[in-house]
Amino acid sequence: MSEIKNYRITSTHLGYEILGIFTFYLHLKGADGVHVSVGGYALDSPDTLSTGTLTKRILTVKGATLIAKILDTVGVANWEELHGQYIRVEDNGLGSYITKFGNLIEDKWIDLDDYFKGDPED
């Protein structure tokens, strides 16, 4: 059973992982001292059109739109302002992934699993 909990964003990452995938993470701390992270989704895709082989990765429209959606949901104007903000999280229990988070006051939510279903360019 899921439970809605409040978390504070303690740090963020927006950039490339070791494998060269462009992604984001929100690192969170709950009132009970529990630390969790949200993110890790690829915001880019391999560019194989020009040569037929992987030469680079390019940011997708869906990935760029998600960055703006996160800022809007949390209620900030830029990525640097995320640090220190409070959000609500749908917590599905120990060992589960956090995929849904929202604004602390307003009824604005992002469900990352739903967002990434279907056409990658929707």
Name every feature range the model reports, one short phrase each.
Residues 1-122:
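Short beta-rich binding modules
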